[in-house]
Amino acid sequence: MSKKPPNRPGITFEIGARLEALDYLQKWYPSRIEKIDYEEGKMLVHFERWSHRYDEWIYWDSNRLRPLERPALRKEGLKDEEDFFDFKAGEEVLARWTDCRYYPAKIEAINKEGTFTVQFYDGVIRCLKRMHIKAMPEDAKGQVKSQHPLSWCCPIDPAGSCNQSMGSEDWIALVKAAAAAAAKNKTGSKPRTSANSNKDKDKDERKWFKVPSKKEETSTCIATPDVEKKEDLPTSSETFGLHVENVPKMVFPQPESTLSNKRKNNQGNSFQAKRARLNKITGLLASKAVGVDGAEKKEDYNETAPMLEQAISPKPQSQKKNEADISSSANTQKPALLSSTLSSGKARSKKCKHESGDSSGCIKPPKSPLSPELIQVEDLTLVSQLSSSVINKTSPPQPVNPPRPFKHSERRRRSQRLATLPMPDDSVEKVSSPSPATDGKVFSISSQNQQESSVPEVPDVAHLPLEKLGPCLPLDLSRGSEVTAPVASDSSYRNECPRAEKEDTQMLPNPSSKAIADGRGAPAAAGISKTEKKVKLEDKSSTAFGKRKEKDKERREKRDKDHYRPKQKKKKKKKKKSKQHDYSDYEDSSLEFLERCSSPLTRSSGSSLASRSMFTEKTTTYQYPRAILSVDLSGENLSDVDFLDDSSTESLLLSGDEYNQDFDSTNFEESQDEDDALNEIVRCICEMDEENGFMIQCEECLCWQHSVCMGLLEESIPEQYICYICRDPPGQRWSAKYRYDKEWLNNGRMCGLSFFKENYSHLNAKKIVSTHHLLADVYGVTEVLHGLQLKIGILKNKHHPDLHLWACSGKRKDQDQIIAGVEKKIAQDTVNREEKKYVQNHKEPPRLPLKMEGTYITSEHSYQKPQSFGQDCKSLADPGSSDDDDVSSLEEEQEFHMRSKNSLQYSAKEHGMPEKNPAEGNTVFVYNDKKGTEDPGDSHLQWQLNLLTHIENVQNEVTSRMDLIEKEVDVLESWLDFTGELEPPDPLARLPQLKRHIKQLLIDMGKVQQIATLCSV
């Protein structure tokens, strides 16, 4: 049954159509459709500039396909009028050159994939996309071509002069043709609604314009009083602009527009006004481009016209008036000396850079809370400034782009992002040096292109009273000082949507977020005191370590369940088992004891020991996978479909740490496949990170290797494959080898030779596991005894500096004896601060004993707490730490417990309340009634008594633990009964034979190693 291709904007499902496809290396390439299988619903995609052997069948609804020019769904139907032009071969157009300017050209051919082969009038032939071609006005067609057929229109070099010689009339004609096209295409555009304004956002993210200071009004001799108004903007537009009307005008013939422009009803009579205003600016470009001074900042080429329009003359009054009347009055009010001053610099202005194309039409009124009284200027001041700059400056200034506040690609600038993120203060620039005509004072205003279309119930800034905007307005433009208008007013924070405020509040505790660094989260958390902020910061950061490990574990489990692989790979599935280590069942257990399993492995590739600390808070039920690349999503609307589609090359940091797991589950589902693909790591001995041929995956680190490099064939893959790095990690100590042999320790299964039918370790796995547990228990008791020896040494020395750690008794109370929940919370917060710092600063946090919470050893807060029995068994099963961590772990734990003890003691004394034990959560009461009258000698004696009591309790625990070890030995000895040997053989009698066997085994293993070395070459 034939299927119908889906409707995907920007993708044409036909043979030969071009699109972008994602290859197996997770890179996007321009591609072409070779074949279409309508039965299966997939296409054969050919990656351009690659061999056809890389052609791949991809389903047409796959997320591995995207259009070359990514269209925004919400911009459909808001296209400019130029999109409706149908160009034909041989038609004269304006085509964009590499300097982003439009030059006259002729269409040579129209290609099938939607591109145009154009020939510029200097003979250069290029293939351009539709978006880089504009229609040439009818009155401009043919008139320049008749003067200079091929040599007149050459691209402009950076010096501002033409590469070839050409006359001034030709340059003027070029300027006229380019500017007229822009005027025709842009003046009839739709009113600047919030959705329509997003189109120009990629071109001009921030406009800078300069206004001469008020002081210059007194120095002018001729003042032309004008009555201007603020232009009536549509109600959906959320910017109030400072439009320019008093623009000096150069006399150019105005081209007549032949195309009908779609206008809205409220702007039906403003076409002629905008037309006149654009022509004035177009005339000024030739003289203005020479530059007011070298330090005058410019945007890109297509941003100069709005900058000039807004910099020339603002509106000092706000009376309601028709826009056509304003433009007509502006034409009649030009001073007489304008023509003379501009004509003096006419010869030089003809060779300067000229902003053409759509630059003259990108009129974007800034969102700036300025009162009209602050920006009144006189026309004569501007005229003198322009004329002096034209005469004194011959070479144009180099355009300086102001820094962008965001470092993402321009496709990622969405209205939701700008609506929810206030602009950072460092994006406001000051003009470094003024023009020669002014007195050193310019007024720099940054227009705020934040379109808040997605924010409901946000009032226009234009409708805000001046009292609210008052704190943001500079009231004094004093001599020698530069005043910069702030980017956002105080009221703009109140206008933000509730979602933005919520996310800012959630992100405040995160020390890694940029919201704290930029000060964006301050308004959202104004009610939080400084101490509460600190506690939140440490609470959040403390759980980051444990949550990351849990996410690693869940990500691997999720990937193990993924059966779909586009390449031919061997993917093993790890069987993770939960650890059950309850010694209370030993009275009834014999063989059941031997079936204990170890903890699941939570180590990812190259990571250290996973956090099993009881200090870390409980993580919630579902986590989100970490990604290799992270994107700053602070305050963003993650439900934006366009943004998620555009984030194919960067993966989202879907972290519960930043968002408190506030996401919708649909976003997690969509990014799951992409996250899987990005987390596929190829780490082979050949050091090539490309997938090629048959790939095998390591069971431990989940990295992929080439089977050829590993010397393994598809039919000879072992049941349990572990890569060379996991088998022998670099820098690993031999004494810590047992930490890495996890499967051997957990399952008791060793790797055997393939020609043996029976593997000894497989037959005796339970015995081996129980033996390992016995050794771990003995090792743990040894460490506890070592700690007891140190404590006895402290007990013997009355003046030992660590004796004060036992100032509080080891008397334990139950949880129900806590005085009040509030006191418990304060004490817990005090403990958490120290604990979180410890978890952050050390790779190996205090370990969680297994099923032994009721014993005193595990709940002690004693001096130099050793690794207990359960802890060592955990350390045997956990491969992530090395001996370097173990050597310093005792000292680190000692310091940590000293800090936590002191903080507990002092906080409890301040509040007069019970402390929280850092290890167990039991309550220990500290009585301070005799604190002031206590004798130092009596206090030392009390400390020694407390320590002695503690040592006795630990000794009792050691005794009970030795009883458990004895039961383990009995269980192991009972295995001899199953073999039929009632009496175990004498080990000393078999010692010589055992030595010979071990020696022979070493010789054989040496030979096997030599064979493996020779075969791997």
From Swiss-Prot:
Composition skew (Polar residues), residue ranges: 186-197, 315-346, 444-454
Zinc finger (PHD-type): 681-729
Sequence ranges assigned to domain Tudor in this UniProt record: 11-71, 85-141
Residue stretches of biased makeup (Acidic residues): 881-894
Cross-link type Glycyl lysine isopeptide (Lys-Gly) (interchain with G-Cter in SUMO2), residue numbers: 75, 79, 530, 851
Residue ranges with Low complexity bias: 515-527
Sections of the chain in a coiled coil: none
A cellular component term, taken from the record's GO annotations: NSL complex
N6-acetyllysine, modified sites: 909
Gene3D superfamilies, sorted: 2.30.30.140, Zinc/RING finger domain, C3HC4 (zinc finger)
Region entry Disordered, spans: 183-248, 307-371, 389-458, 473-585, 862-923
The keyword Metal-binding is annotated on this UniProt entry: yes
Location(s) in or outside the cell: Nucleus
InterPro entries reported for this sequence: Agenet_dom_plant (IPR014002), KDM4-like_Tudor (IPR040477), PHF20-like (IPR043449), Tudor (IPR002999), Tudor_PHF20L1 (IPR047405), Zinc_finger_PHD-type_CS (IPR019786), Znf_FYVE_PHD (IPR011011), Znf_RING/FYVE/PHD (IPR013083)
One MF annotation (Gene Ontology) recorded for this entry: zinc ion binding
Pfam families in the cross-refs: PHD20L1_u1, PHD_5, Tudor_2
Designated name of the protein: PHD finger protein 20-like protein 1
